[in-house]
């Protein structure tokens, strides 16, 4: 059962192979003071969802067609938890996280509806990951050496 608590999700991403993911998630979560994390009803529902995911390999997520629910859940919790949830379903059913993203793209009417907001947060996450790679210490030193004529 994936532990979908905020603490367990943070630990999961901290121990993930790519340390940049944890840094990006931590940065995003530092400004996510509007999420429903900590709400007792949500926390109980997330715990129950984690338990239900124990048997996820027996469920055909494609036939279940609950992408809207995943979009709404992920859109209202901290980024790390949302990404952990998507990663958990994708591990058991490869491509299921992509189906959720595609469903959001197909159903979004604006960036302010739940699907649009979900997509916007995913785009921010991906762009921050990209920027962290572009402006990594190694590349900045390489540019500095080139500007100083050492390269």
Curated annotation (Swiss-Prot):
Q: What is its main location?
A: cytoplasm
Show the InterPro entries listed in the entry. Answer: IcmW
**What GO cellular component term, any one, is given?**
cytoplasm
Q: Which GO terms describe its biological process?
A: protein transport
What's a Pfam family this protein contains?
Answer: IcmW
Q: Which UniProt keywords apply?
A: Cytoplasm, Protein transport, Transport, Virulence
Q: How is its activity regulated?
A: Interaction with DotL is critical for the export of IcmSW-dependent substrates.
* Subcellular location per the Swiss-Prot or TrEMBL entry: Cytoplasm
Q: State whether keyword Transport applies.
A: yes
* Record flagged with keyword Cell membrane: no
Phenotype upon knockout is: Deletion of the gene leads to a strong decrease in intracellular growth in human monocytes. Mutant is unable to evade phagosome lysosome fusion, but retains the pore-forming activity. Mutation severely impairs the translocation into host cells of multiple effector proteins, including SidA, SidB, SidC, SidD, SidE, SidG, SidH, WipA and WipB. Loss of this gene has an effect on the levels of IcmS.
Describe the function of this protein.
Answer: Component of the Dot/Icm type IVB secretion system (T4BSS), which is used to inject bacterial effector proteins into eukaryotic host cells. Part of a subcomplex which recruits effector proteins and delivers them to the core transmembrane subcomplex. The IcmS/IcmW protein complex plays an important role in protein translocation by interacting with multiple Dot/Icm effector proteins to facilitate their translocation into host cells. Interaction promotes conformational changes in the effector protein, which may facilitate display of a C-terminal translocation signal.
- Fill in the subunit field for this protein: The T4BSS is a complex nanomachine composed of several subcomplexes. This subunit is part of the Type IV Coupling Complex (T4CC), a subcomplex composed of the DotLMNYZ core and the IcmSW-LvgA adapter subunits, linked by the C-terminal tail of DotL. Interacts with IcmS. IcmS and IcmW form a stable complex. Interaction with IcmS greatly enhances the stability of IcmW. Interacts directly with the type 4 coupling protein DotL. Interacts with LvgA. Interacts with effector proteins.
Q: What is this protein called?
A: Type 4 adapter protein IcmW
Which gene underlies this protein?
icmW
């Amino acid at each position: 059962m994936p532990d979908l608590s905020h603490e367990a999700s943070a630990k999961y991403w901290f121990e993930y192979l790519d340390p940049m993911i944890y840094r990006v998630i931590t940065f995003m979560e530092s400004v996510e003071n509007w999420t429903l994390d900590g709400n007792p009803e949500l926390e109980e529902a997330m715990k129950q969802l984690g338990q239900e995911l124990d048997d996820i390999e027996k469920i055909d997520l494609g036939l279940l067609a609950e992408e809207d629910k995943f979009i709404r859940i992920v859109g209202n919790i901290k980024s790390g938890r949302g990404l952990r949830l998507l990663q958990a379903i994708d591990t058991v059913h490869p491509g299921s996280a992509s189906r959720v993203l595609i469903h959001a793209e197909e159903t979004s009417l604006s960036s302010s509806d739940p699907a649009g907001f979900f997509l916007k947060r995913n785009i921010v996450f991906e762009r921050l990951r990209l920027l962290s790679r572009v402006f990594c210490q190694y590349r900045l030193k390489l540019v500095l050496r080139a500007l100083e004529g050492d390269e």
